[in-house]
Amino acid sequence: MNKPLLSELIIDIGNTSIAFASFKDNKINLFVKMKTNLMLRHDEVFSFFKENFDFNVNQVFISSVVPILNGIFENVIFSFFKIKPLFISFDLNYDLTFNPYKSGKFLLGSDVFANLVAAIENYSFENVLVVDLGTACTIFAVSRQDGILGGLINSGPLINFNSLLDNAYLLKKFSISTPSNLLERTTSGSVNSGLFYQYKYLIEGVYRDIKKMYKKEFNLIIAGGNANLLLPLIEIEFIFNIHLTVEGIRILGNSIVF
């Protein structure tokens, strides 16, 4: 039996996890992750592909913020699919419906770049604030008219949580959860409150300030694997899209001008 043809595999190599998404008829029909490990071997990645990707692809597009793993994935993909993947980055030329770098190119992570492109290309918004809560918390603004406006980068919730546990002698490991109240009475509850309310106020504060700064309305899109516990606290209308980054990588991969 011939394997069904799925034309595109998108890979997002992040600091904490590596996301894989296959697209068929412009829709994601498979989304899986593996933990990022700087010591990953060729045979481990090949076994993961064999277990999860029993299909053919025409193209593989990759965004990577862990360059040490790029060679392994390039070799495995060639061994498995017999094709060479395309790595997207901010400094390539793309045929998009808007100019991301209207005021000139500047260094930007490929994952952040993908988020911002997807926010404009996949939605009918003119101005968007994009929040990605992963290993890092990135908050960037983008405009269809003016391109990428800039942003903020902070450590993500789990980084802050683990740093606190590592440096506070009496704090013991416990599960994080969405706080029930702003003011909690137990140590674990207070840590949860402090952890998530700081991001609530950061996101809502930046959102209010950029509206004043640019005198324009902005839509809010939230992405990232660590966002789900924060979402109930956000009091601004938003769209949550867990697949925003892979959607952006796919758009960029198909828009590269050679």
UniProtKB/Swiss-Prot annotation:
Primary site of residence: cytoplasm
The record's listing under CDD domains reads:
ASKHA_NBD_PanK-III
Question: Entry cofactor note text?
Answer: A monovalent cation. Ammonium or potassium.
Q: Which residues bind ATP?
A: D12, I13, G14, N15, T16, S17, I18, A19, T135
Q: Which reaction does it catalyse?
A: (R)-pantothenate + ATP = (R)-4'-phosphopantothenate + ADP + H(+)
Q: State a single Pfam family of this protein.
A: Pan_kinase
Classification via HAMAP family: Pantothen_kinase_3
Can you name this protein?
Answer: Type III pantothenate kinase
